A protein has these predicted regions:
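Short, solvent-exposed loop/turn elements at domain surfaces
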Residues: 28, 39-45, 118, 192, ...
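Short, structured beta-strand segments at or near domain termini in extracellular proteins/domains
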Residues: 220-234
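Short proline/glycine-enriched turn/loop segments at secondary-structure junctions
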Residues: 211-218
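Functional-site microenvironments in short loops/helix caps that host divalent-cation chemistry
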Residues: 77-210
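Processing junctions and N-termini across compartments
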Residues: 6-7, 14, 86, 114, ...
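Structured loops at beta-to-helix junctions and adjacent beta-edge loops in soluble globular domains
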Residues: 22-23, 33-35, 40, 112-114, ...
Length: 234
């Protein structure tokens, strides 16, 4: 038979997750993925990687937190929530996401209160839709264009998870600022943190928040990570 996973006595979180310490309101704290999620397809007795450049649509997928892989973009909040659930996790609440991003010292960029160029993946020079389609007017950016799988395959766009090793904080979470936007569990549809083109327009660093889209929206720039309640070591 298959051996069941055994948790460490030193951490209440699953592999690939960081433990965020408790507060007076939540003494146990919570767990959050160290890395932006990648996906594996798990329907029809399969367990195979899902392309990070394709929307999962009707496929059954589960979220994975792993270093050194292309994180999943092109994903809606509903799809992200289902992928977290399939992994025994859940999407992070806004407050959980923001606390983990800011780190234990509660700083705007996690690593500090001042932006340090190059620490995070946030300075891609050319908008990928313009680069790929030569479409400089946003009126020409339709749903099909914004979900083209080639966008995140262009050089200098999305980075491998954890590749920007200093885009982190003492909690040991990576890429919460930049790389891909990240969905939270807000039922109205919220994603946070900015992406490889911008971590400024809708707020600086961990304060970056977009609320313009509903939970079924997806495009190349949006990914996610999962949270979970800690499990007692006893």
């Amino acid at each position: 038979g298959v051996a069941r996973p055994v948790r460490s006595q030193l951490t209440p979180c699953a592999p690939g997750m960081a433990h965020i310490p408790g507060t007076a309101q939540n003494p146990a704290g919570y767990c959050i993925d160290r890395y932006e999620a990648s996906l594996r397809r798990v329907d029809d007795n399969r367990d195979v990687p899902w392309s990070p450049y394709l929307t999962p649509e009707r496929a059954t997928v589960r979220a994975v937190s792993a270093r050194g892989v292309v994180p999943q973009g092109y994903v809606s909040q509903r799809q992200a929530a289902a992928a977290c659930s399939a992994a025994g996790k859940r999407l992070c609440a806004d407050t959980e996401w923001t606390r983990a991003c800011r780190g234990p010292r509660v700083q705007t960029f996690g690593y500090g209160n001042q932006r340090e160029t190059g620490r995070c993946n946030e300075n891609h020079r050319w908008h990928p839709v313009v680069q790929l389609f030569r479409a400089t007017s946003q009126e020409l950016w339709g749903h099909v264009q914004m979900n083209d799988p080639q966008l995140n395959q262009l050089p200098g766009t999305v980075a491998l998870t954890g590749a920007h090793g200093s885009c982190s904080n003492e909690f040991g979470v990576y890429d919460m600022v930049g790389n891909l936007h990240e969905w939270t569990a807000d039922p109205n549809g919220t994603f946070r943190g900015g992406y490889y083109m911008d971590t400024t327009i809708n707020g600086a660093g961990c304060n970056y928040v977009t609320t313009a889209h509903d939970t079924s929206y997806h495009d190349y720039s949006i990914g996610f990570r999962c949270c979970a309640d800690p499990v007692s070591a006893h």
